From Swiss-Prot:
This is Phosphatidylethanolamine N-methyltransferase. Belongs to the class VI-like SAM-binding methyltransferase superfamily. CHO2 family. Pathway: Phospholipid metabolism; phosphatidylcholine biosynthesis. Pfam families: PEMT. Its EC number is 2.1.1.17. Its main location: endoplasmic reticulum. It comes from Eremothecium gossypii (strain ATCC 10895 / CBS 109.51 / FGSC 9923 / NRRL Y-1056) (Yeast).
Length: 843
């Protein structure tokens, strides 16, 4: 089956026409070669083709109807003629959708036309002399088909289909003719003149847009018939099936779902724009709506029964996995259409969302000013968009949102549920405020153009439909950006390529803003709503370009990101559009690269400075020595590196005339000391020691670091050790500075060295616990019960411990959580192990 009457096109493999194609009857399985047939217009109006009795009658009825229209317009008046042809159109439209619909429904389920023909022997040899109906049917087919056509050689299904085509020709041509005549009668009352069209105004714009829509409608019809031929045009697969045929998506079937029911009715709205008559628009909407009912209750069930559903039933839904593996998970609250779905009376956030919506709508009773409502709507849209952008961007780059909850003791799934609440709340708030803004603006209008209003609501309906299609294709998991938060639940990474995503790569950027632009029409092009619609459009494009697309490439691969939709393939066939698309891709790519600047700039800067200082650091005083004693296990020549908690030993030597008892040695971060090598301008923050035991007798820690001191005749030398009482417990590049007397004049500077974070053992929870205890014991910050105690070492605070865990395991944990577990190291390490396991699975 195709869709000039359906969403899918069917064509025989490697064939341009169904003529000569092998076909098979649906029930009997009888095979035959399909003879050549012609489309509707050629059958009726091409004088070179033979005409059957019914085809002549159809042509004459069309001519007679046009003549009667002219007569009734001249004699009975335009209003009477309009009502007459409106009634005719509705009658033929019901005959189409209800009459043909019932026939096809029963033919699809019971093959009742085929069975009726067989039961009455309509095409049997010799039956013509016994039954006037058989005689007429055989005469009709014989007069229509070429002379060499032998009716008896073809199955009943094919002959019945040929007769069914005649009925379809009558109904479709009269349906089209009466609609066109009704539009022409309405256009006769229009105020559109040629002089008016020569100037740029609303009337000329709608006429030009309407004309363009008409031309596009003609292209849709022609291209659809090119793809599917008359086999699908006349619902051939309700009678017989083509062998070796496949569902195809080509031409117009590649750019729209159900093109003959969607964009195939674009002309209806085109003529409504041209006439500017809202009554024509309402009639067009009614006709289009009836056609959608025909699609839903006749076409779609038959397509799914013959070819299977669009979305494979075997597809594994991540939503079902989540529910199956987590008993405490419930489906999230969703704002669908104008109501809420999945409301859970035991979930407080649902009451908050619904209550906020109700309160916002109730605010209309306060008669707020237009300016106030617009400002609130603009503020809400900007803030909600920025919040969504920030969370998703950070979540994509470093799992920030998940880590935020994990570090505070919550689960990965709970963080996802909180995101669902935030996203749905933001969506609800932006839509509710936009609706209120539109209502206030609409009330303020002195007069209303109902044609604009109706077209506005059509765009709103299109937006609602698109959201429904997106939800059907992505499921709740995709709707809430689940692949940002629960990557470990995705067993087979694959982007949705069915439903609306077969035709549009990012439908939210096109159809997802239709409602916002619909409010522009409803409010008669108010500046406020134009601004809001523009922001809506830009925010959607920014989200897709700078958040979704980079994440898709990361999770699903660049080849999935480069996949073209049906509309994209069609449009990129035009060279100017392809050039513009390539330029836009390069531009957005460069912006994405700017956003992806490494966050490790500080670490890299420290390394660069350390390398430079290795060459420039020297003794600032002659005949002096100031060296860090090397540990052969941890350091090699030219590379000083110590692990957090390791003691560092320094040897120094100074001429006696330069030495003072109050000389001291300080420990500093290289980045904090600045470029002054002769004077230290920053505080040591108590990371210092004396050079002897007499200079600072009241400072126990300062003199406790002195391990050796010798005063000779010509020089003074010593050895000090910086241990847990004086060291930093954060990674970085450091240096020691030897200061004269109690001031900050620098006499000597050590080579720069690194303090690094030890890699804790993450093989098992017990291994992590043991390695953590060993490290903290070395740092002297555990009490007798094995708990972390800040008072044991003032340099190793909660914040420092957090950084230590983050840098050594990649998992962050909050101080609030550590307080909740009373700083129990086993509880903390078990939580870190679980976090690390989850975060690794998300990569």
């Amino acid at each position: 089956m195709t869709e000039t009457k359906s969403g899918k096109a069917v064509a025989p493999a490697a064939q341009d026409s169904v003529a000569g194609t092998l076909a098979v009857c649906r029930s009997s399985g009888e095979e035959f070669r399909v003879p050549k047939t012609h489309d509707m217009l050629r059958s009726l109006f091409d004088p070179r083709l033979r005409k059957s009795f019914l085809e002549l009658c159809i042509t004459l009825s069309l001519v007679a109807n046009c003549a009667f229209c002219y007569w009734s317009w001249r004699v009975m008046g335009g209003e009477w003629a309009m009502r007459m042809y409106l009634a005719q159109y509705l009658a033929w439209r019901l005959t189409y959708n209800l009459g043909i619909g019932l026939i096809l429904h029963y033919q699809s389920h019971y093959e009742f036309l085929t069975e009726f023909a067989k039961r009455n022997g309509l095409f049997a040899s010799g039956a013509a002399s016994k039954s006037w109906l058989a005689s007429f049917c055989q005469f009709e087919i014989a007069s229509k088909m070429p002379r060499e056509y032998d009716m008896a050689q073809y199955p009943t299904e094919f002959n019945v289909w040929l007769l069914f085509r005649q009925f379809v020709d009558l109904v479709l041509m009269q349906d089209f003719t009466t609609y066109v005549l009704y539009v022409l009668l309405s256009f006769s009352k229009s105020q559109v003149t040629w002089s008016l069209l020569q100037h740029l105004n609303w009337t000329s714009c709608r006429v030009y847009v309407g004309t363009l829509m008409l031309l596009l409608n003609v292209w849709v019809k022609m291209d659809a018939h090119r793809v599917v031929k008359d086999y699908a045009w006349y619902w051939g697969d309700f009678f017989f099936l083509l062998k070796d045929s496949n569902l195809i998506f080509d031409g117009v079937f590649n750019i729209s779902p159900h093109p003959m029911y969607s964009i195939g009715y674009m002309g209806y709205y085109g003529v409504s724009l041209i006439t500017g008559d809202y009554r024509v628009l309402l009639v067009s909407i009614l006709g289009h709506f009836l056609q959608f009912l025909f699609l839903k209750y006749v076409e779609t069930p038959h397509i799914e029964r013959i070819y299977g559903p669009d979305q494979p039933s075997s597809i594994e839904r991540v939503d079902d996995q989540i529910i199956k593996n987590n008993r405490n998970y419930t489906r999230p609250l969703m704002m669908t259409y104008f109501w809420f779905k999945n409301f859970d009376p035991l979930r407080p956030t649902d009451y908050f969302t619904v209550g906020t919506a109700a309160a916002s709508i109730s605010a209309i009773l306060l008669n707020p000013k237009k300016e106030t409502v617009f400002a609130i709507t603009l503020f809400v849209k900007l803030v909600t968009s920025m919040v969504n952008f920030f969370i998703l961007r950070r979540q994509s780059t470093d799992k920030w949102f998940t880590k935020l909850f994990l570090r505070n003791g919550y689960t990965q799934l709970y963080s996802y549920q909180m995101w669902q609440f935030i996203y749905n709340f933001n969506l609800m708030l932006s839509y509710v405020t936009l609706a209120l803004q539109t209502w206030i603006q609409f009330q303020a209008l002195s007069q209303h153009d109902y044609t604009n209003v109706i077209f506005g609501f059509i765009l709103v309906a299109l937006h609602i439909w698109a959201d429904g299609e997106i939800l059907n294709a992505l499921t709740e998991f995709g709707w809430f950006y689940g692949d940002f938060f629960l990557t470990n639940y995705i067993q087979r990474p694959k982007l949705a390529s069915h439903g609306i995503y077969r035709y549009l790569k990012n439908p939210e950027c096109v159809l997802g803003v239709a409602g916002a632009w619909g409010t522009v029409l409803i409010t008669d092009f108010s500046v406020e709503n134009i601004i809001l619609a523009t922001i809506w459009t830009l925010s959607n494009h920014i989200m897709v370009t700078f958040v979704e697309s980079p994440h898709v490439a990361k999770v699903y691969g660049n080849e999935m990101l480069a996949r073209q939709s049906g509309v994209g393939k069609t449009l990129l066939g035009f060279t100017p559009i392809k050039h513009f698309s390539d330029w836009l891709d390069k531009f957005s790519g460069s912006l994405i690269d700017m956003l992806n600047v490494s966050t490790e700039g500080r670490d890299q800067l420290e390394d660069v400075i350390a390398a430079a200082l290795q060459a420039t650091t020297r003794k600032l005083s002659p005949d002096s020595e100031f060296e860090i004693n090397r540990d052969s296990e941890n350091n090699s020549d030219g590379d000083f590196s110590f692990t957090i908690g390791d003691s560092i030993e320094i040897s120094w030597k100074l001429p006696r005339e330069l030495y003072h008892d109050e000389d001291w040695i300080g420990l500093y971060r290289v980045l904090e000391t600045g470029e002054d090598r002769y004077r230290t301008l920053v505080s040591s923050r108590d990371h210092w020691c004396a050079t002897n035991t007499m200079g600072y007798p009241k400072s126990v820690k300062a003199i406790g670091a002195v391990k050796e001191f010798t005063k000779g005749d010509t020089c003074v030398q010593g050895r000090v050790v910086f241990d847990h009482n004086l060291l930093y417990f954060e990674k970085g590049v450091y240096e020691f500075r030897y200061h004269s007397t109690s001031g900050h004049k620098v006499l000597m500077i050590s080579p720069p060295f690194k303090i690094t974070v030890p890699q804790l053992d993450l093989d098992t929870p017990e291994a992590l616990y043991q390695s953590t205890v060993k490290l903290l014991e070395k740092c002297h910050c555990l009490n007798e019960n094995g708990r972390f105690e800040h008072s044991k070492n003032k340099y190793l605070s909660e914040r420092t411990l957090q950084k230590l865990f983050r840098n050594s395991t990649g998992a962050d944990i909050s101080s609030d959580y550590m307080k909740r577990v009373n700083y129990e190291i086993r509880e903390i390490t078990e939580r870190i192990y679980e976090m690390k396991k989850i975060l690794d699975s998300l990569r």
